[in-house]
């Protein structure tokens, strides 16, 4: 009996020694191989030091700690490497409960837990690194299943600069935490979008910055929170900040011709269906709430710009790569300012829309038999004076190119429009009161028709010219216009004037310009032009 016990004990000791020896050998092998491979692949430019490696064969666990990266800038950048500069720390990589199985061409990998913690990293991509899809090979015929019980990713301060042709763009992420429960990916042969499933997802972010090419604009996000089970997404302040003055922007950033500044308050998405997004690649949201936004845009026509066809709003929605449906989008307190400097102008024309509130109803890019349009209803003030209301019916399906806009503008002095009219068309409104303006626009992406009733009285103008940097009045033409061309009042002795007019869309101009052209066609007819 004692002999049997000794034999068993000896076997156990031998097994443990072999087991611990194998673990010790694997730990050293991983530590050495990782450093050598990175050094060799980068020609000694990127140097990695692995602090500790712990392996438990019985527990099916791998833990790697304190991996540091640094760059020897005296070494040349080898062609084909992804990064020309890397500096940072991987605090820990932990994988527990690892299982690997292969049968024929099917591979299955699973883990009970995966954790990656990178508190700090600075990465600069190599200039010749290209983001290309891998060529189709026989490996695409394999089926691979990946399953992770608990997935945890933590990124501290991460800076990444990417080369883009002869320019660079950069990204900065601050305190990203990403957690998923029961994450699964199952790829079928030749699958383009393999199904990705998880029971829950929680993401939090304390800050994000994206520096655009040519240092033209900076995108900032203060915070982000995504919760799958609570079906809510929350975004803190968002800002798009131009990096050059308005007058110089088009010259210094030809890829971004319009100076645009946007700041938005809190954006909250309620009732998003995480499971439908993962299974069907369809984003379904119950409601979106936007609290406060300021939008300013400036177009400088004195600087020659490359012409680019611009899509209308509904065309952009139709062409989004992801199908989506949002029951309601609530817009609260939005201020919009648009400035335009004409080719021969010295100061820009300005128009403002103040304290806008609106609601999108059934916003989607997936047409259904009972829904061909979605609707936007909005109200606010024009030039912080006249109360305006508008309703937009916009098409869902790409084959439907018809839209409708119906609106109303309340009483205001027409002279309040001089900041827009005078610099752009060289006309100054001396007097004139708007009583009521009603319009209906029907059109497509080529042409629109407007029906308008523009009620006003005591309209008088001065026609201007600019000479030697000074604005002067065209006296004779002003007298002619007020006496013979312009209709001073509507209604007048002939009664109320209702007009119809058409407008052609300039495909190189914005949606706002198209609406303005449509309204201007009706306004001209209303005053007798």
Predicted segments, located by residue:
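Flexible, surface-exposed loop regions and adjacent strand-edge segments
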Residues: 128-134, 303-309, 424-425, 467-473
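Terminal hydrophobic membrane-targeting helix
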Residues: 18-123, 141-142, 148, 163-265, ...
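Elongated, acidic membrane-bridging lipid-handling scaffolds
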Residues: 95-98, 102, 107-231, 310-403
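Extended terminal
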Residues: 2-9, 395, 401, 408, ...
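Flexible, solvent-exposed coil segments and beta strand-coil junctions
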Residues: 72-76, 131-136, 202, 244-251, ...
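Outer-membrane beta-barrel proteins
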Residues: 123-126, 245, 297-299, 461-463
């Amino acid at each position: 009996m004692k002999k049997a016990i000794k034999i068993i004990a000896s076997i156990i000791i031998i097994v443990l020694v072999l087991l611990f020896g194998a673990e010790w050998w694997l730990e050293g092998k991983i530590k050495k191989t990782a450093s050598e491979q990175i050094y060799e692949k980068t020609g000694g430019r990127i140097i990695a030091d692995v602090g500790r490696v712990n392996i438990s064969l019985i527990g099916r666990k791998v833990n790697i700690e304190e991996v540091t990266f640094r760059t020897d800038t005296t070494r040349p950048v080898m062609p084909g490497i992804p990064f020309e500069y890397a500096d940072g720390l991987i605090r820990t990589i932990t994988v527990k409960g690892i299982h690997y199985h292969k049968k024929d061409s099917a591979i299955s990998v699973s883990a009970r837990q995966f954790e990656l913690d990178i508190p700090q990293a600075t990465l600069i991509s190599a200039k010749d690194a290209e983001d290309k899809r891998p060529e189709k090979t026989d490996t695409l015929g394999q089926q691979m299943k990946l399953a992770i019980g608990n997935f945890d990713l933590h990124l501290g301060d991460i800076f990444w600069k990417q080369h883009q042709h002869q320019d660079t763009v950069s990204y900065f992420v601050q305190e990203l935490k990403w957690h998923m429960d029961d994450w699964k990916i199952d790829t079928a042969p030749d699958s383009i979008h393999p199904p990705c499933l998880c029971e829950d997802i929680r993401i939090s972010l304390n800050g994000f910055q994206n520096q655009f090419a040519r240092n033209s604009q900076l995108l900032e996000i203060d915070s982000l929170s995504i919760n799958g089970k609570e079906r809510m997404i929350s975004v803190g302040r968002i800002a798009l900040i131009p990096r050059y003055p308005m007058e110089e922007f088009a010259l210094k950033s030809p890829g971004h011709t319009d100076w645009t500044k946007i700041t938005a308050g809190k954006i909250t998405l309620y009732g998003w269906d995480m499971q439908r997004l993962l299974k069907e690649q369809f984003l379904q949201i119950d409601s979106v709430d936007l609290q406060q936004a300021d939008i300013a845009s400036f177009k400088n026509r004195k600087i020659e710009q490359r012409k680019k066809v611009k899509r209308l709003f509904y065309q952009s929605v139709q062409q989004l790569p992801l199908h989506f449906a949002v029951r309601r989008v609530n817009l609260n307190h939005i201020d919009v300012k648009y400035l335009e400097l004409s080719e021969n102008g010295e100061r820009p024309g300005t128009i403002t829309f103040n304290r806008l509130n609106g609601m999108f109803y059934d916003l989607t890019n997936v047409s259904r038999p009972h829904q061909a349009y979605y609707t936007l209803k909005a109200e606010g003030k024009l030039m912080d004076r006249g109360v305006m209301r508008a309703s937009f019916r916009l098409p869902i399906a790409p084959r439907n190119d018809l839209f409708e806009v119906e609106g109303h503008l309340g009483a205001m002095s027409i002279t309040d429009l001089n900041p827009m009219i005078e610099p752009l068309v060289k006309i100054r409104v001396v007097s004139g009161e708007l009583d009521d303006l009603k319009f209906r626009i029907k059109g497509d992406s080529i042409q629109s028709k407007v029906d308008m009733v523009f009620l006003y009285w005591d309209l008088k103008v001065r026609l201007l010219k600019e000479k030697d940097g000074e604005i002067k009045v065209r006296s004779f033409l002003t007298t002619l216009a007020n006496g013979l061309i312009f209709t001073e009042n509507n209604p007048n002795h002939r009664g109320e004037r209702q007009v119809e007019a058409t407008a052609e869309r300039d495909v190189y101009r914005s949606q706002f310009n198209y609406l303005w052209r449509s309204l201007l066609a009706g306004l001209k007819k209303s005053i007798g032009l």
